[in-house]
Design a protein with these regions (language model features):
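Surface-exposed cleft-lining segments at the edges of enzyme active sites
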Residues: 71-76, 104-106, 170-179, 205-214
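Solvent-exposed loop/turn segments at secondary-structure junctions
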Residues: 56-59, 104-108, 134-138, 160-161, ...
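C-terminal motif of bacterial Sec signal peptides marking the signal peptidase cleavage site
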Residues: 13-15
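N-terminal, active-site-proximal structural segment of metallo-dependent hydrolase catalytic domains
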Residues: 17-149, 357-359
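Metal-dependent phosphoester-hydrolase catalytic domains
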Residues: 17-39, 213-214, 225-238, 245-359
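Sec-dependent signal peptide recognition
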Residues: 1-8
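Beta-strand-turn-beta hairpins that frame and shape the catalytic cleft
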Residues: 41-51, 148-162, 176, 181-205, ...
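Active-site beta-strand/loop signature of hydrolases that rely on acidic residues for catalysis
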Residues: 49-56, 86-113, 155, 190, ...
Length: 359
């Protein structure tokens, strides 16, 4: 997602301290920690862990916002609560042990100040959470955006420790003012205290969508370095998120039917065909590469128009093993067992992490 030019801020910022907007982050800083209001008993897993990644579009469901060629900037509290209830129902239905979320709002004007991390903890069987901001400003005086606080979160049945936000590089092609208020991409790493497992980590990220300056590829490289370091240290990890990249052997790379004509350029992945090759070659993917090559459609996890799923942007990887055949994109009743297209522009992706191999 890309913000419109915030030229309205130029005279404002020239006459005051720009730090008043608080948009920046340290290279590494502690995550914000959460706990459900009422904890649910979490037994030790026996054979597998259910792992899910899900971009929830900040509880926006199928409201058409300005970057989608719509007119909306903010939601009412009623809209947010209805949409969050739908998302919570999906999470309860899939019943993950570890849930990696992207585009989660906490105390943001656009989502009526609903803390969506706390909402999902309090309305599912997940107990603990860690949050890392990717878009933060106390106030954006443009188009009614107001306070912005959105990011990535990892929720789990068991405690999360050593949770940290690791900053990713920003787009260098943007004008300085846009870059100041634009998303600050990050990795959220957290150790999950799964009973019977030592040194088990969750790595969650949401990578750059629109860049022509190599930023996305650089971010993927940093993610690879993070995973390589954990692997070299003997740790076990599950990694996932919205990578905003297509796998090799994608039949379509641009000119998707669900794109709109507006302020924002459509998604084109031409020239990026090899961006995820190292992840697929070095680690186990919940989406087998050969199955995707044979038939792309069952693995599509994004729908821009709310009518059909058109491409694959969301992934799960591990340096251990997934249960064979357990990876699935929950598109609808026939493909994944539950209708999801009405609640977000992304579908949840799940897989079963094989405990016996890891242990």
């Amino acid at each position: 997602m890309k913000l419109p030019l915030l030229t309205v801020l130029l005279p404002l910022m020239s006459g005051c301290d720009a730090t008043m907007f608080r948009t920046g982050f340290e290279p590494v800083e502690p995550a914000i920690m959460y706990q459900a209001a009422t904890l649910t008993d979490a037994e030790a897993p026996s054979e597998a862990l259910s792992v899910v990644t899900y971009n929830i579009k900040f509880g926006g469901a199928r409201i058409t916002f300005f970057w989608e060629c719509g007119e909306r900037y903010n939601m009412t509290s009623e809209e947010v609560n209805v949409n969050m209830a739908g998302l919570a129902e999906i999470v309860r239905e899939i019943d993950p042990d570890i849930l990696m979320l992207q585009e989660v709002d906490i105390e943001a004007t656009r989502s009526a100040y609903v803390d969506q991390v706390q909402y999902l903890l309090d309305n599912t069987d997940l107990n603990y959470g860690a949050y890392a901001s990717q878009w933060k400003s106390d106030y954006i005086p443009s188009d009614g955006l107001g306070r912005t606080e959105s990011g990535i979160a990892t929720l789990a049945r068991w405690p999360l420790v050593e949770a940290e936000r690791v900053a990713l590089p920003l787009q260098v092609e943007q004008p300085a003012l846009d870059r100041y208020f634009y998303l600050k991409r990050a990795i959220l790493r957290a150790q999950v205290e799964v009973p019977g497992m030592d040194d088990f980590w969750s790595i969650n990220t949401h990578l750059e969508a629109f860049s022509e300056d190599g930023t996305k590829q650089t971010q993927i490289g940093i993610l690879e370095e993070e995973l390589m370091a954990l692997d070299a240290a003997g740790a076990t990890f599950v990694a996932g998120g919205d990578f905003n990249s297509l796998p090799r052997d994608s039949e379509q790379l641009s000119d998707f039917a669900d794109e709109c004509d507006g302020l924002f350029k459509g998604d084109s992945y031409v020239g990026e065909e090899d961006f995820l090759d190292t992840l697929f070659s070095d680690y186990s993917s919940a989406m087998p590469a050969d199955e995707y090559s044979a038939d792309n459609a069952p693995w599509f996890s994004f729908s821009g128009d709310g009518v059909e799923w058109t491409r694959t942007l969301d992934y799960l990887f591990t340096n251990a093993s997934w249960v064979d055949g357990s990876g699935v994109v929950h598109q609808d009743v026939d493909q994944g067992g539950i209708e999801t297209i009405q609640w977000s522009d992304h579908a949840p992706v799940s897989a079963l992490f094989e405990l016996e191999v890891a242990q």
